[in-house]
């Protein structure tokens, strides 16, 4: 190994060699991205980026316990490693004992591709997609609508090495496509999004046709007041709600009485029935089409993550099984405090157990209700009930006698995803979906459409 190498696996090895701490974890994330943007039926920009982020976690043993220090920097080269290591060690020496301290993980076999070059994306990922998008521009132009949006593809190669002997590597592709169609006067708008690993399974023509149909629905405008309505939540909206629920499902917080998963009188609600529908909410690092890291990658400690757990193998986990709460997210530390199993968070989320009905079939079986496009600007109101507020966007449609009667105004909603699971009367066919609100952080989801008989539209919103 040379002192000036920039190969990721050699960078992490050199970083470990420089460490003087009692323990050390090094995470190198090699990023590459390719993107396209368009407006008014024409491409506007495209680009490719490359980058590296190096995270050093130093652990220092003391009389009162083990402290940790974490420092991350981007664009790090071999010549800058020592200062980064010393900064992490200084942070550890200046910190008190880490509450989540545990021995570093051992015994995980080395990844066979650990010494390989990082995976990279490029504009070639759009070779088939870009011409198909151009054809959609032409159809939209001829149909009197304008398309706006972007496509982004990212590949992150993560190299994780520790002083305890772990040498792990994971390549994570992540693609998102968001498409807006607008009427020329900007009074009507519709949205569709897709999550993809490689842009080979997205169809711009089908998305444009879907948006054209929705703009047609919006030609008839109907004003509705705030209130509770039977509502069909599409998979993207279900994903946005349940992802936030997953982020709020830390075992320790629940055991200490701070969340919706806290049991009155103490303990957690694990074992309680949350839904009368036979729904199963689960994560699996090996789920086809939604694959994610099969081991813990923790750049910092928090409610649902511990830097001491880096490299811990991940397994398929059922958070809710058949409507019953089975697990909360638990690190080794929080599992020890609560007596619950070690169940770290995993980078995908799947809800299944519904019927085989499509959203269109559920619409056809609706006497009167609302059909949403997506949710937006979701914020927490009350952690004790997980009450969330947010807005509908880009199309809310009134369904009467199995058909869309027209577009209604947007609303602000106030709902708890946990309560919604309990009140849901139907779930349809599970499909891959892109959560619109959380797509910058979480894209690997598969959800069904869900029918709620009394969704709370708390006030009218004037947005398009």
What positions do the PLM features span?
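Dual-mode signal for accessory low-complexity, basic/Gly-rich regions
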Residues: 110, 266-464
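Active-site bordering "gate/hinge" segments
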Residues: 1-306, 321-322, 347, 403, ...
């Amino acid at each position: 190994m040379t002192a000036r190498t920039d190969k990721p696996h050699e960078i992490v090895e050199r970083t470990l060699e420089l460490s003087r701490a009692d323990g050390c974890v090094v995470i190198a994330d090699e990023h590459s991205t390719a993107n396209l943007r368009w407006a008014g039926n024409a491409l506007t920009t495209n680009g490719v980026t490359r980058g590296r982020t190096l995270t050093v976690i130093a652990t220092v043993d003391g009389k009162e316990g083990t402290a940790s220090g974490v420092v991350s920097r981007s664009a790090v080269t071999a010549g800058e490693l020592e200062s980064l290591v010393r900064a992490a060690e200084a942070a550890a020496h200046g910190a008190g004992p880490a509450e989540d301290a545990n021995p570093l993980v051992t015994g995980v076999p080395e990844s066979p591709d650990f010494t390989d070059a990082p995976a990279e994306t490029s504009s070639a990922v759009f070779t088939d997609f870009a011409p198909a998008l151009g054809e959609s521009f032409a159809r939209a132009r001829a149909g009197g609508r304008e398309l706006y949006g972007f496509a982004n593809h990212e590949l992150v190669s993560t190299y994780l090495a520790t002083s305890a002997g772990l040498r792990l590597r994971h390549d994570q592709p992540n693609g998102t496509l968001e498409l807006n169609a607008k009427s020329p006067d900007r009074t009507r708008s519709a949205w569709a999004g897709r999550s993809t690993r490689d842009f080979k399974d997205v169809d711009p023509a089908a998305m444009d046709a879907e948006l054209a149909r929705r703009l047609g629905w919006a030609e008839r405008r109907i004003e509705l007041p705030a209130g509770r309505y039977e509502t069909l939540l599409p998979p993207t909206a279900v994903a946005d709600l349940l992802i936030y629920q997953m982020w709020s499902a830390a075992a320790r917080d629940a055991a200490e009485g701070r969340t919706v998963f806290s049991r009155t009188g103490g303990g957690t609600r694990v074992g309680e029935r949350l839904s009368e529908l036979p729904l199963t909410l689960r994560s699996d690092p090996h789920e086809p089409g939604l694959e994610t890291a099969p081991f813990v990658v923790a750049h910092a400690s928090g409610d649902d993550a511990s830097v001491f757990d880096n490299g811990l193998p991940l397994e398929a986990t059922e958070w809710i099984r058949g409507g019953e709460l089975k697990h909360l997210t638990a690190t080794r530390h929080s599992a020890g405090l609560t007596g619950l199993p070690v169940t770290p968070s995993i980078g995908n989320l799947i809800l299944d157990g519904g019927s085989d009905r499509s959203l269109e079939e559920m619409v056809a079986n609706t006497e009167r209700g609302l059909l949403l496009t997506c949710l937006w600007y979701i914020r927490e109101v009350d952690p004790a009930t997980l009450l969330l507020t947010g807005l509908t966007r880009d199309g809310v449609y009134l369904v009467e006698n199995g058909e869309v009667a027209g577009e209604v105004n947007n609303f602000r909603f106030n709902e708890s995803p946990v309560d919604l699971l309990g009140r849901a009367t139907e779930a349809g066919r599970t499909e891959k979906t892109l959560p619109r609100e959380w797509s910058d952080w979480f894209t690997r989801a598969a959800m069904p459409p869900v029918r709620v008989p009394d969704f709370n539209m708390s006030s009218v919103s004037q947005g398009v």
